[in-house]
């Protein structure tokens, strides 16, 4: 039964690819809606709009610091250090000229093509959500809808996970790319398993911190969350 449903899902993905691209995919290389305007170094203890903009810019680059409140506390200093480490900069937790200049550049994109895990409208996109930052996209689909691997890779997590994820599958791909599939009702893979792109990994559910059935989908590059829609513009069903 699962095999037949997966075959049908792949056909639908191939037939609907251009419609989805026109309706919900972000344009390639889309830049975040905010940039760091400050030229003055920002450090622990700072407050105000420049700090809030720094928090947003770091989140867009995949290094969220918790609540976006315009206050430079320990969490923000930690996010700055993680960004500096990933960028090969001196790690000091201070957003100086070089750090700020790199944050003005467009966020990184996935270095491999990714396919849609399922075809569905986007509920919550990647980006600010009130005073928090949503690190993935929510794809709205009926409970039980098949969820497919976005690319070939090895399963690194398959099971319940605390923190609101519910039933979660994570897959490690090439070039430091990792994909995450949360709130699943059923998981069909196990840790260590090698998957082809488009393989069935589970089914849509509402486990964990979810108010209704949907797939929370994340893409991370060397640990930094990126906008999944920018990574999915190729739209092949698990290339």
What spans do the regions from the language model cover?
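Acidic, Ser/Thr/Pro/Gly-enriched interdomain connector segments
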Residues: 2-15, 22-70
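Intrinsically disordered, low-complexity Ser/Thr-rich linker and spacer segments
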Residues: 33-40, 97-119, 134, 234-239
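Short acidic, glycine/serine/threonine-rich helix-capping segments at coil-helix boundaries
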Residues: 41-52, 56-101, 208-210
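Surface-exposed, glycine-biased beta-strand/turn segments
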Residues: 105-166, 197, 206, 210, ...
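Zn2+-dependent peptidoglycan hydrolase active-site motif and core
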Residues: 134, 150-188, 213-218
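Surface-exposed strand-loop junctions at beta-sheet edges and helix termini
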Residues: 141, 150, 184, 189-190, ...
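Conserved, short, structured surface segments that act as functional micro-motifs
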Residues: 169-173, 193-239
């Amino acid at each position: 039964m699962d095999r037949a449903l997966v075959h049908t899902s792949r056909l639908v993905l191939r037939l609907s690819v251009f419609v989805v691209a026109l309706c919900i995919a972000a344009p390639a290389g889309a830049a975040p809606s905010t940039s760091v305007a400050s030229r003055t170094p920002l450090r622990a203890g700072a407050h105000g709009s420049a700090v809030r903009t720094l928090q947003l810019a770091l989140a867009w680059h995949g290094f969220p610091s918790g609540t976006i409140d315009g206050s430079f506390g320990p969490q923000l200093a930690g996010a700055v250090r993680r960004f500096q480490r990933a960028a090969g900069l001196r790690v000091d937790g201070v957003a100086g000229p070089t750090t700020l200049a790199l944050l003005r550049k467009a966020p990184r994109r996935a270095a491999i093509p990714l396919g849609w895990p399922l075809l569905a409208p986007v509920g919550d996109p990647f980006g600010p959500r009130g005073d928090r930052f949503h690190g993935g996209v929510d794809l709205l689909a009926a409970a039980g809808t098949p969820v497919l691997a976005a690319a070939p890779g090895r399963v690194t997590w398959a099971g319940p996970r605390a923190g609101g994820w519910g039933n979660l599958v994570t897959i490690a791909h090439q070039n430091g790319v990792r994909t995450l599939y949360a709130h699943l009702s059923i998981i069909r893979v196990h840790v260590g398993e090698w998957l082809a792109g488009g393989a069935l990994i589970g089914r849509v559910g509402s486990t964990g911190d979810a108010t209704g059935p949907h797939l929370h989908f994340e893409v991370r590059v060397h640990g930094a969350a990126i906008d999944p829609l920018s990574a999915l513009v190729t739209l092949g069903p698990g290339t």
